[in-house]
Amino acid sequence: MDEPDDAARAGRADARRNRERLLTAAKAAFAELGADVSLEEIARRAGVGIATLYRNFASREAILEAVYRRDVEDHSASATRLLETMAPGEALHEWMRRALNYAATKRGMSSALASITDGSSELYAYSSRLYVDAVTLLVQRATESGDIREGVDPMDLLGALGGLAHGVGRADWQARALRLLDILMDGLRYKQPTLRPAPE
């Protein structure tokens, strides 16, 4: 074997592991301590030096964006994984439950996220596109299987999720939001359509 090549591969693998450790540590630190947590604290939790953190992320905003981007990608991709193991209607329900649970976990970094995901940002457009694609797939499959009624607009479901997430932070929010989601899903399963047409 070519030893320099082996060393280079090992170095790249170490770099990937360090980046993943930093992202995992940052997510937990932001959730527990808020978006103002020190970068030194994130590095300490990840078990790396502050120089390693800065080699991967130039600023607090950069690591916050990377955490958010990874979470959005993981949650969006879970739509396909859920469809492989659940009936389409249950997959849709579970995906929406996870969306609400994620809203609860990111509460500590919500103010900082607002500054990097405003309506005009590339990151906002990117995350919106992934979510729209995921819920569109789930609604399509659940409609085709007969698990939910016809005529459901995926954008309505995303809007409903946004409304349910609005009260995050209240003591009873999560239990109440999940109950309301169950009611919403019961309505989607009701087969006598009373829906107004989706707006053009």
Regions from the language model: what does each represent?
Residues 57, 64-71:
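Alpha-helical DNA-contacting segments of helix-turn-helix folds
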Residues 47-57:
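Short hydrophobic/aromatic patch on the recognition helix
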Residues 24, 89-104, 133, 178-186:
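Amphipathic alpha-helical segments that line or abut small-molecule/effector binding pockets
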Residues 1-6, 133, 137-145, 170-200:
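C-terminal peripheral helix-coil segments that are non-catalytic and often amphipathic
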Residues 111-121, 197-199:
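Short linear capping/connector segments at secondary-structure termini
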Residues 73, 119-155, 159-170, 175:
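Amphipathic alpha-helical packing segments from all-alpha helical-bundle domains
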Residues 1-45, 62-65:
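Basic, helix-initiating cap at the start of DNA-binding domains
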Residues 66, 73, 77-105, 120-123:
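Hydrophobic alpha-helical connector segments
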